[in-house]
């Protein structure tokens, strides 16, 4: 097998549900080293031996890759810094306006960006199958996406529902 240099990760929104899951996954994979954790407020405790910081150039300097699962406002803070430092970024944040989506496309001309409303294999397979079904059925069928969430869901429709809607 190939020997790879470890990927130095910066994880934004480290106290959020997805941030916590990414930390857990990255710690269990020897190919990753978490070098930076950020949050939108001062945090006075260490997480996996790292004191979270705010989104600053200094915070992201050691990272090869930034993983962002936050909110649109924060994502653009991070994108601005990532662009300046020429850092790769994975964006799992959802809820962007059309104008914001276009701005992300502009940033993608300067730095590598991987963006998806849902990163799971199952949902991406469902997306692919939805596109096939939609093409097969044609315009003679009306398709709708319905979703139900817990009361704390921050964005609705969800990024997943929007992805499926585009596939239809």
PLM features: residue spans?
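Rossmann-fold NAD(P)-binding glycine/threonine-rich loop
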Residues: 76-80, 84-85, 92-115, 124-133
């Amino acid at each position: 097998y190939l020997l790879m240099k470890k990927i130095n990760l910066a994880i934004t929104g480290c106290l959020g549900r997805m941030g916590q899951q990414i930390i857990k996954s990255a710690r269990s994979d020897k190919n990753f080293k978490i070098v930076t954790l950020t949050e939108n407020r001062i945090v006075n405790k260490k997480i996996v031996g790292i004191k979270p910081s705010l989104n600053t150039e200094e915070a992201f300097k050691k990272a090869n890759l930034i993983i962002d699962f936050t909110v649109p406002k924060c994502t653009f803070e991070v994108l601005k810094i990532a662009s300046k430092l020429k850092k790769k970024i994975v964006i799992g944040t959802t809820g962007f306006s059309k104008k914001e989506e276009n701005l992300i496309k502009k940033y993608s001309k300067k730095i590598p960006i991987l963006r998806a409303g849902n990163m799971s294999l199952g949902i991406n397979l469902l997306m692919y199958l939805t596109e096939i079904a939609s093409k097969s059925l044609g315009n003679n069928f009306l398709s709708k996406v319905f979703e139900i969430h817990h009361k704390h869901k921050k964005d609705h429709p969800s990024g997943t529902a929007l992805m499926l809607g585009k596939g239809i």
